[in-house]
């Protein structure tokens, strides 16, 4: 049986452990894998519920480039007012999609009420997103760096 499997990041910022989960599931014969980045637990909850530590999913992309990576801005932010800017940041960083918590009446939700948005707000957020097209490949960037070095 080959069904889609989405694997959330580990609670602690441990890329090797996260990659190990993909390897184990893949070795069991399940090949339709994707990642969900929900941020990482921290004692410091001043801004985010879970620290984004964007470098970890970026490194995951570098190590497993064919793996779709989705961002969960609801769990990273922990507050509905952070969902929109985190959605845009995830898109700017090249994530493949978003998983956003939505509820018709978020304040009455049984769990995670503070981080949920209404379907109308979600529609508004999604319509505001700027999806940037890749304009440079890694090869092009290398060529540009060489040109800069040559001119220095």
Sequence positions of predicted segments:
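Catalytic alpha/beta core domains of metabolic enzymes, predominantly
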Residues: 1-105
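Short amphipathic alpha-helical patches
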Residues: 21, 83, 110-114, 145-149
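Short, electropositive alpha-helical surface patch
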Residues: 86-87, 119, 151-152
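Generic signature of intrinsically disordered, low-complexity segments enriched in small/polar residues
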Residues: 98, 113, 127, 143-144
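C-terminal helical cap(s) of enzyme catalytic domains, especially alpha/beta-barrels
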Residues: 104-138
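Divalent-metal-activated hydrolytic enzyme cores
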Residues: 135-151
């Amino acid at each position: 049986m080959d069904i889609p499997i989405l694997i959330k990041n580990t609670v602690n910022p441990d890329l090797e452990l996260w990659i190990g989960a993909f390897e184990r599931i893949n070795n069991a014969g399940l090949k339709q894998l994707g990642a969900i980045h929900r941020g990482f637990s921290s004692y410091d909850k001043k801004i985010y519920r879970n620290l984004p530590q964007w470098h970890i999913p970026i490194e995951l992309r570098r190590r497993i480039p064919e793996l779709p990576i989705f961002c969960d801005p609801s769990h990273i932010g922990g507050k509905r007012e952070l969902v929109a800017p985190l959605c845009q940041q995830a898109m700017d960083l090249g994530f493949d999609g978003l998983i956003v918590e939505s509820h018709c009446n978020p304040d009455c939700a049984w769990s995670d009420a503070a981080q949920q948005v209404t379907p109308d707000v979600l529609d508004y957020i999604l319509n505001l997103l700027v999806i940037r097209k890749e304009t440079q490949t890694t090869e092009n960037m290398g060529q540009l760096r060489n040109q800069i070095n040559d001119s220095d």
